[in-house]
């Protein structure tokens, strides 16, 4: 549907690291500890990337209101 299409568009617009973290956390429902091992990145950095990704996606989706 339209909301799903906009979500996918918003995710595609993210920087690569944020997109990867968001996809693994949101869609794959992985834990930060698992993502940390895969990407060889600290959990703190992953949480920051995820938070920024959610913020950018939210702003993008609200731009259609």
Language-model features: locations:
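C-terminal edge and immediately downstream basic/flexible tail or linker adjoining helix-turn-helix-like DNA-binding
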Residues: 6, 37-40, 54-65
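A short pre-motif secondary-structure segment
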Residues: 21-25
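Residues within the DNA-recognition helix of helix-turn-helix
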Residues: 49-52
């Amino acid at each position: 549907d339209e909301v799903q299409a906009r979500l996918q568009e918003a995710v595609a617009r993210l920087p690569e690291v944020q997109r990867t973290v968001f996809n693994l956390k949101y869609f794959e429902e992985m834990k930060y500890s698992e993502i940390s091992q895969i990407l060889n990145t600290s959990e703190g950095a992953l949480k920051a990337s995820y938070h920024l990704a959610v913020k950018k996606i939210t702003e993008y989706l609200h731009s259609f209101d």
